[in-house]
């Protein structure tokens, strides 16, 4: 398929404001380095990201799902594929309370630290470990992010996941097969669309103190990274 055709189809799904060509990846990674992506698309709702990925698979286009770009190294020559960013999937809210548990809903592009702040402001404990982790919900679920004795596996109830066949399945904590920095998402190259977490009530001052301590300690840790190369 000609370049202009795939770009036009992506614009038809997402609108011109969400599609760009030769987009500098340095603008979308925490390291602030990296050459251009051939095409960059940032769907602003879940239906659009589903339709975008369906199109790319149908047209046999190489693509990469990008969250916050945390610890991602992009080669200077860029990426000769289509980057699909979750950065516009930002819905975050407290869904409900059930007994001593409170449930939080977060779309894939929500920053993990933002979810941790919402939890702390609502005096909800369990998410303190996430306060200093520079990643998105989608990436955090995919790799079962964690630190200082806490991890996503401890608080996630379920995630809406885009499967290889294009269907969307609500996968439970157990079905996600969360293990140390791994999950079924990574094993099968699936896409996290959103997630639901369950947290308990706690003491706000204790929650904030723990988050501050974890954030300070995290600054001294070595950084690992993923390398995205041009093809």
Question: Which residues make up each language-model segment?
Answer:
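Charged, low-complexity, helix/coiled-coil-prone segments
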Residues: 1, 50-62, 152-160, 212-229
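Short clusters of hydrophobic/aromatic residues that line enzyme substrate/ligand-binding pockets
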Residues: 19, 25, 31, 92, ...
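A gly/ser-rich beta-alpha-beta helix-loop segment of oxidoreductase catalytic cores
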Residues: 113-157, 163, 228-229
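Phosphate/pyrophosphate- and phosphate-bearing ligand-binding catalytic cores of soluble enzymes
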Residues: 20-21, 72, 162-229
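Anion-binding (especially nucleotide phosphate/pyrophosphate-binding) glycine-rich loop
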Residues: 3-137
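Residues in well-ordered beta-strands of folded domains
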Residues: 42, 85, 105-107, 130, ...
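Structural signature of FAD isoalloxazine-binding scaffolds in flavoprotein oxidoreductases
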Residues: 34-35, 41-46, 73-91, 142-172, ...
């Amino acid at each position: 398929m000609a370049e202009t055709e795939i770009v036009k189809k992506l614009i038809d799904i997402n609108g011109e404001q969400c599609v760009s060509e030769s987009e500098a990846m340095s603008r979308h990674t925490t390291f602030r380095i990296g050459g251009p992506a051939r095409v960059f698309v940032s769907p602003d709702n879940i239906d659009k990201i589903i339709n975008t990925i369906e199109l790319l698979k149908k047209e046999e286009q190489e693509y990469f799902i990008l969250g916050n770009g945390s610890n991602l190294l992009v080669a200077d020559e860029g990426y000769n594929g289509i980057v699909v960013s979750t950065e516009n999937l930002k819905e975050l809210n407290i869904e409900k309370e059930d007994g001593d548990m409170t449930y939080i809903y977060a779309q894939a592009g929500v920053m993990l630290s933002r979810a941790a702040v919402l939890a702390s402001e609502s005096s909800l404990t369990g998410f303190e470990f996430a306060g200093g982790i520079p990643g998105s919900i989608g990436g955090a679920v995919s790799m079962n992010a964690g630190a200082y004795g806490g991890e996503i596996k401890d608080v996630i109830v379920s995630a809406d996941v885009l499967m290889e066949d294009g269907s969307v399945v609500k996968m439970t904590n157990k079905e996600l097969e969360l293990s140390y920095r791994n999950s079924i998402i990574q094993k099968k190259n699936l896409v996290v669309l959103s997630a639901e977490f369950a947290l308990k009530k706690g003491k706000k001052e204790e929650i904030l103190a723990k988050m501050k301590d974890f954030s300070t300690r995290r600054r001294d840790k070595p950084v690992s990274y993923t390398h995205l190369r041009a093809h």
